[in-house]
Amino acid sequence: MTIVVATLYNIQQKGKTLHIMPLMPTHYIAQIRDHMDEHGLDSQAWLATFYLSKDLLHQPGYLIEYHQFEQLILAAVEECGQTNIGSSIGKRLSITSHGTLGFALLHCASLRQAIELCQRYIGIRTPLMDLTFKQDQKSFIIGIRELFNIQNIRRFFIESLCVTLQQSLSVVVGHNKLFKCLESNFPQPSY
């Protein structure tokens, strides 16, 4: 049986090629807004530039087009002047920031169960990525696979995802030294 969730994608037809881009939830944009507020930046003006408001961000099920999501992030990075804003946003996210996925993680009995839960349900939090997972004798290996071209926000997104994964999985196992190695396809940042 195939299930198609049509509300999650915006299909744009250009010539004969269909470009499918996801519609994005706004719950993490609210975290960026809070980060900007804490640093004395005008988040209302930032949102207004993209025809958004604080109230819209908190409407359940509110979605924006990927292009708008991308432009919001790029503008926030520029406005904040922080190259590490992705990891800063990741640090802001507690396990319960991830809605029902976070609450389900709280009930996992093992690291393996938590990783498998994240792998299976990450799509309810972001349509941009999925996770791969394998285990060998000494380690768990989590891979992050882009489902769409997110080149312009890749560093921000990967950093925030890795930090929030580290934090959430640490809650499950009770200690915070889980990630021993992080390999990425972009240069190592100075921070």
Q: How would you label these PLM feature ranges?
A:
Residues 111-191:
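Alpha-helical bundle regulatory/interaction domains
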